[in-house]
Amino acid sequence: MKVRDLTLLFIAGGKSSRFGGEPKMLSKIGPNEETLFEMSIGQMMNRIHIVQIHVVVNKENKDKIMEEVKRVNQKHEICKNITFNIQEIPEFRSKPWGTADAVSSAKEHIHTPFLLLNSDDLYDSKTFQFIGEQCDLSKNYIIGFTLGSTLSGNQKANRAFISVDKEEKVIELQEKLNIERDYYSNHQLENQYVSVNLLLLQPSVLSSMDHELNEFKSQHIEDATAEALLPNFLNSLMKQDILSMELFKTSGQWNGVTYKDDVQSVREAFLSPRKEN
């Protein structure tokens, strides 16, 4: 069944503290100074049918981000439905609650199957082509990249390790924090699949997650550092048989921006003759 009518849900509510506070999705990484967001949209165009672009933002970055989203949408005539919501930060916290909160906060705006994406990541046109050709719109998928394709140099990163049964149904996600490439063997780098927050989900998942999130917040109401990590909440829904997900393996190349130094390496990846945009 070929995927049709997908909403894009971009997470962009973070503070970008390791990036000087500027929205990473506005980094100019394309051969003609295109932003990361425009390059991301370019990877999806003609591979999936986009009916809505929704962005989770914060109060500080809202205007800059939405200006770029609208500009790119108008330039490429992508869709008529551009929406956003602000991920609120309680007074007792300096940062948002986390990725699960960002995703859940969009629940009032998402009414069709959607692709969840990090706004500062690029997932490769090949990945979206396979999603468009092979994914069943009625199911939930986590798109897995090999561990090695998502780790570079000696920079630390967080990755959700994916465990599946013999039918490729996801049975557990294990979030590992501050890992480096050197921690793992070549076999693990080539064969362990991880999530970098690219998922195809049904809108009902958002309501289920919101219920879990409310409980989490009530338990950590005085903890300014507690973080609602998306893999943990997906795990909880799977254990309760509320959510069933399949692993969709991609051989696409992931690129992401966390630090200022990453901008140049991502730009070089797109300028490489081997790179398909």
Regions found by a protein language model. Name each.
Residues 2-68, 91:
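N-terminal glycine-rich phosphate-binding loop and ensuing alpha1 helix
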Residues 18, 64-65, 126, 233, ...:
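Phosphate- and divalent-cation-binding pockets in alpha/beta enzyme and binding domains
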Residues 8-10, 55, 116, 142-143, ...:
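Structural beta-sheet core signal
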Residues 60-84:
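Acidic donor-binding segment of Leloir-type glycosyltransferases
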Residues 124-204:
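Conserved core of the sugar-phosphate nucleotidyltransferase
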Residues 26, 161-164, 247:
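A structural signal for short hydrophobic beta-strand segments in well-ordered beta-sheet cores
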Residues 2-4, 173-277:
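Conserved alpha/beta core of the MobA/IspD/sugar-nucleotide pyrophosphorylase nucleotidyltransferase superfamily
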Residues 79-161:
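Conserved beta-loop-beta/alpha segment of the NTase-like Rossmann-fold superfamily
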